[in-house]
Amino acid sequence: MEKIKVALVSLGCDKNRIDSELMLYKLNEEAELVKNPKEAQVIIVNTCGFIETAKEESINTILQMASYKKTHNCKVLVVTGCLTQRYKGELKELIPEMDIMLGVNDYDKLLESIKVFLKSGEKSFYHKYSDTKINEGNRILTTPTYTAYVRIAEGCNNFCTYCAIPRIRGKYRSRKKENILKEVENLAKQGVKEIILIAQDTTMYGIDIYGKKVLHELLRDISKVEGVKWIRLLYCYPEEITKELIEEIKNNDKVCKYLDLPIQQISNSVLKRMGRKTTKETIINIIKKLRKEIEGITLRTSLIVGFPGETEGEFSELKEFVSDVKLDKLGVFKYSKEEGTSAALMEEQIDEEIKEKREEEIMILQQSISKDINKEKIGKIYEVIVEGIKEDMYYGRNYEMSPEIDGEIYFEKDENVRIGDIIKVKVTHSLEYDLIGVVYNELSK
C-alpha cells in the first residue's frame, strides 16, 4: 500500500483504546497516520456498543465520517469494534457506505482488506467470534508519553443480567505473564512512568491459565521493571480481592493506593436481579478491610440507578450506603436497556425521568462528600505527575486520581517543571473534585 493517509477515530473505553493503538501500529509502516479525519483517504471508526448512548455516538460518528466521502478526501470507510461485533447484520444494511467491517477479533485482516478495496473496490465484512484469541502486540500510544494502559485479560465470565460484554468479547482469558512484562518493559523504555492495568475484571487475572488468581504476583513483577513509577489498578471486583492482593498493594511502593471497585448497586435484592455474585455485606466488609489494612487508600466505584424493579426503598438503601461509606470517588450511570440481555426482558422497567432524578440525587450527595474529603487534604504533600497547562497553571494527578475520570491538582507554573515529571505539590486549597497547591521544595516548607 502506498503511503495513503489514514485516520482512526476511537470511541468507548480504555480497552477499546488499546485495540485502536494495536491497529495504528499495524498501519504505521505502510500508511501516513493523520489526526484529522478530513485529511484522510482511509477513515477507521473503532466503535463502542456497550450502552444505548454509546451506540448512538458510534452510529452518528460513522455517518459523519461517511459524509467525508462527498465533502473531503475519504475513499475507504472502515468500521470495527464492539458495535460491529454485536450488530454485524443490521449495520451492513443500515450503513451501506461502509466499505470494510471488522469484528473485535479481526484486526489482523485490517491492512489486507484496505489494500484489496483500494485495488479492486471489493468490500470486506468480517465478524469472527472467539473465546480464545487475545489482541496483543506492539502499539502506537494515544495516551500522553508518561502513561499507558495495559490490558491483562480479555472477555468476561460474569454474565451480569444487564451487560452484553461476554457476548461481544467472549469468555475471560488472561494474557501470559511474560507477554505482559515484555510489553511493560517496552513501554518503560519509551518513557512511560504510569502503568494502568485493565480488564473486564482485573482481580480474576490468572485464574484460567495458572489455576489461581495471581494479580498480586503480576504487580510484584511489574514493579521490578526499571522506569515504572506508578502501577494503577482499575476494574477490581470486590468479592474477588484476595488477602495476597491487599498485602501487595499495602507493601509495594510502586502500586498506587487506589482501587476502582465497580459495585454497581448495594441492595441485595437488586444485586440478585443483576446477577452479581456478591452481597451488600461482602461489599461493605471488603471496603472496611481495605481501609483498615491500607493506609490512605482511595476507593472509587460506579453505580447504576434505575435498574428494572428498583423501588424507592432500594434506592434509599443505595443513598444511605453512599452517605455512610463515603467513597472517595464515585460515578453514576442510568440503567440502559440492552438487547440480548435478560434485564431487558424484566418487568417494571423504570421511567427515564425517574432514572435522571435518581442519578442527580446520588451525584449531589457525592459532590458534598467529595468536597469534605478534599478539605481534609489541605496541607498535605503529594507526588504529582505533571500533565499540562490550563489558564497559566500547571495541572497533574496524584495517586488518588485516575486519568480522565477523577479530579486534578492545579499549581502555579515553575520553570523547573516539565510535563511528565513527577514532583511534590503541597495542597493549599480544595474544590469539590479538584485541588490547588504549590510546588513543594525546601523554600516552600
Curated annotation (Swiss-Prot):
Belongs to the methylthiotransferase family. RimO subfamily. The keyword Nucleus does not apply. Its cofactor is [4Fe-4S] cluster. [4Fe-4S] cluster 1 binds at residues 13, 48, 82. Its main location: cytoplasm. It is an enzyme of class 2 (transferase). The keyword Transferase applies. This is Ribosomal protein uS12 methylthiotransferase RimO. Residues 4-119 form the MTTase N-terminal domain. Residues 375-441 form the TRAM domain. Residues 142-372 form the Radical SAM core domain. It comes from the Bacteria.
